[in-house]
A protein has these predicted regions:
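A short, conserved structural fragment
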Residues: 47-58
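Short amphipathic alpha-helical interface segments
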Residues: 2-31, 83
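Short amphipathic alpha-helical interaction segments
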Residues: 33-48
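Short, amphipathic alpha-helical interaction segments positioned at domain boundaries
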Residues: 66-83
Length: 83
């Protein structure tokens, strides 16, 4: 697995949520690049800071009315495209 900074992990997860709102699908796709522990920790942090909200038991959504989606750095674009 490639090592990402904590900020890069957060950005990756936010953009992955935009691509896959279903939490189960999201976690399966992200497991190819991050550990499940990192994924869960970042999702919990994003929910706690209100950058992501849970809609029902299985759907995650970026809370773009509360905070803008961060710009995707060039080094992460191919990673998101390949998810």
């Amino acid at each position: 697995m490639v090592e990402f900074s904590s900020e890069e992990k957060t950005i990756l997860i936010q953009h992955a949520i935009k691509k896959y709102e279903n939490e189960e699908t999201l976690i399966e796709k992200l497991k190819t690049i991050l550990s499940e522990k990192d994924i869960q920790r970042n999702i919990d942090t994003l929910i706690g800071t209100q950058r992501v909200r849970r809609i029902g038991p299985e759907v995650l959504q970026n809370n773009e009315s509360h905070t803008e989606l961060p710009e995707l750095p060039d080094n992460l674009k191919s990673t998101i495209e390949n998810l």
